């Protein structure tokens, strides 16, 4: 008999998450978990859901790639004219979610968003493969197009334009940083009694840790 969606379930049994074991600094704790995801050779451990919302409350979400993190926040790069770029310009609040299934772990981050510096955007752009740099010029992200041929034609045009020369960063393309006000670490546990530890940023810049009911 075929399973239905309602029949799909997994019991989480790997390990727990204790207030006594986590770091008091959520960025250090994130790095610990991220390094373990890297060591476990998880596919694209830097993939994260980015949720945004319009000023009138219409939400949208998509997968993006984390490209830098430190105590300033979590950075990704995009076309500023895209839907997410426009929504964040109008309402600079966002949520991120990392899901590392093999480790039975989730990290949820909420905060406000700022552009990274021009220098940071330039430095990251210069590390991208040439075709990816061209792609930043080719795609008017989130706009309706007639067919894929539109992209392929524009790709050839920009390839010819920048052949044998440096490809500059488009002014509409760069980095955004989510500066967290809260970070939740979730560890799957048996019987759906999961461990959830929430770090909340206080006015003095320190963090408090609360355990949440699953």
Curated annotation (Swiss-Prot):
GO biological process, one term: pyridoxine biosynthetic process
Source organism (scientific name): Nostoc punctiforme (strain ATCC 29133 / PCC 73102)
Pathway: Cofactor metabolism; pyridoxal 5'-phosphate salvage; pyridoxal 5'-phosphate from pyridoxamine 5'-phosphate: step 1/1; Cofactor metabolism; pyridoxal 5'-phosphate salvage; pyridoxal 5'-phosphate from pyridoxine 5'-phosphate: step 1/1
Keywords for this protein: Flavoprotein, FMN, Oxidoreductase, Pyridoxine biosynthesis
Identification of the protein by name: Pyridoxine/pyridoxamine 5'-phosphate oxidase
PROSITE patterns linked to this entry: PYRIDOX_OXIDASE
Gene: pdxH
Role according to the record: Catalyzes the oxidation of either pyridoxine 5'-phosphate (PNP) or pyridoxamine 5'-phosphate (PMP) into pyridoxal 5'-phosphate (PLP).
Entry keyword annotation includes Glycosyltransferase: no
